[in-house]
């Protein structure tokens, strides 16, 4: 099976497809405004927007990663709907793990009580070696007129409680906007 590659050069021609995927895959409360995302894409620093490319299929999705001193945070990860259930996500997680080395990787996910899809997403991450490490996490709002969103934190490592609390504090302070 051919794997997907991470491409950190997002060509302008791909942005309409990626924007549509971003806006369809994530509810408004779990995504920043597209204009803010475009600013992050062009900036240097901890934020990385990776186009997911397959040699035979072309662009299949994207993943956004934040690189911190001793861990990575996957803010958004989506595969085009027509290409889901073909193990592309699994291949992408493997590619991400190769890219980040031994650093722990964290994702936020909706609780399984939110929807059937949320439960399937948790199962997907668990099948790929992730564990729920925090169930009482409140994602700060992306928009000034909204409240935080209750989510779980999943990790590629079990981690010590103090480290997980520091991860959550880093996300609150450095990833989300402050109003």
Report the location of each language-model feature.
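A short helix-loop-beta-strand connector motif used in the catalytic cores of GNAT acetyltransferases and
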Residues: 41-51, 147
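Conserved catalytic-core motifs of GNAT/GCN5-like acyltransferases
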Residues: 108, 121-146
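Charged helix-capping and loop-helix junction motifs
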Residues: 90-92, 118-124
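Conserved beta strand-loop-helix elements of the APE1-like EEP
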Residues: 153-159
């Amino acid at each position: 099976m051919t794997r997907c590659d991470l491409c950190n050069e997002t060509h302008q021609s791909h942005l309409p497809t990626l924007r549509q995927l971003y806006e369809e895959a994530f509810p408004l409360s779990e995504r920043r405004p597209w204009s803010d995302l475009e600013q992050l894409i062009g900036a240097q620093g901890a934020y990385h927007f990776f186009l997911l490319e397959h040699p035979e299929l072309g662009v299949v999705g994207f993943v956004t990663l934040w690189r911190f001193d001793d861990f990575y945070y996957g803010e958004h990860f989506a595969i085009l709907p027509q290409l889901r259930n073909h193990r592309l996500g699994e291949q992408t997680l493997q590619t991400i793990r190769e890219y980040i080395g031994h650093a722990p990787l964290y994702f936020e996910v909706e609780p399984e009580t939110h929807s059937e899809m949320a439960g399937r997403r948790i199962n997907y991450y668990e099948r790929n070696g992730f564990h729920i490490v925090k169930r009482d996490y409140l994602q700060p709002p992306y928009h000034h007129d909204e409240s935080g969103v209750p989510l779980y934190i999943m990790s590629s490592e079990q981690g010590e409680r103090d480290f997980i609390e520091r991860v959550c504090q880093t996300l609150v302070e450095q990833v989300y906007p402050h109003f």
